[in-house]
């Protein structure tokens, strides 16, 4: 496959919308991994969202069986960590991959909760009104929200 450098931009424009620079994807060809390595990675990602995994609390009772990996990125000591969560599901027949990155989101759990909403929305368990309703909580716990 191809391993691409992570980028959020495809081009840079001036204030009038004129393209200053096109940013072409940069990638390198990589060799595949062994089946045993793949199996270990897959099992590890499954454990992250189940039982005592680091993101299990965000996915308890989720209607779709998924696998994922949590992560926090430290930029510097004066700002909150970036929160990240990568995932795919359903676990045994993947249809979708979801990645959530929240700049200065404090901890990966916060990204995992957003990820849960995406899965529930994509597979039709909730709709946009549920997501926008601040009293709605997909975690099944009493929730308090403040603006």
Language-model features: where?
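Short, highly charged C-terminal tails/helix-capping segments
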Residues: 130-147
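Active-site beta-strand/loop architecture of penicillin-binding DD-peptidases
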Residues: 1-28, 42-129
């Amino acid at each position: 496959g191809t391993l691409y450098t992570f980028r959020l931009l495809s081009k840079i424009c001036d204030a009038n919308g004129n393209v200053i620079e096109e940013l072409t994807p940069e990638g390198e060809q990589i060799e595949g991994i062994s089946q045993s390595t793949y199996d270990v990675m897959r099992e590890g990602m499954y454990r992250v969202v189940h039982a005592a995994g680091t993101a299990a609390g965000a996915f308890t009772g989720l209607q779709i069986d998924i696998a994922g990996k949590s992560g926090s990125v430290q930029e510097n000591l004066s700002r909150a960590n970036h929160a990240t969560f990568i995932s795919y599901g359903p676990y045994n027949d993947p249809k979708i991959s979801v990645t959530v990155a929240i700049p200065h989101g404090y901890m990966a759990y916060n990204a995992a909760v957003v990820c849960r909403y995406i899965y529930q929305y994509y597979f039709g368990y909730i709709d946009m009104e549920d997501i926008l309703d601040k009293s709605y909580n997909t975690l099944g716990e009493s929730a308090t929200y403040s603006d």
